[in-house]
Amino acid sequence: VDALAAARAIAELKVQPRPVSLAYEASPVMDIILGAAKEGASLYAVTDPAGITHRVWEVKREDAVGAIRAMLDQAPEPVLADDPAYAGALVGASQLLADEARSAGTYTGKEPFNFTVAVLFPAAQVSGGAPQVPTGLLTHQVARF
């Protein structure tokens, strides 16, 4: 797939089809924090065609969000665990949409296309390939609003 064509297709959607997968170096403290976040009911539980169930939890408590941020600040930078072409297409789509907004005189820098939704996985979970949230789940949820 041509990189520019992929970027144009995403820009036309005006929504990110799926999160970018990133891998981080796990730590026992992070495992405890995330384990506590997963004690409640998940927001989504989607089973893909391969029979794998993907669950998504929302972390709302300010102290938990702060603890996760603090742990990520101390850890090495997450690395891309996704298809580099997909990540590049997202960057390209963002640039196309930014250029369009600048031409229209409406660019503020706070548009949704300036941000990317990412999913963090412990590096040990991605050694055989990055797990991915099913394509379309994010698009569907954004389209609801």
Residue spans for each PLM region:
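Surface-exposed, charge/polar-rich loops and edge strands
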Residues: 1-145
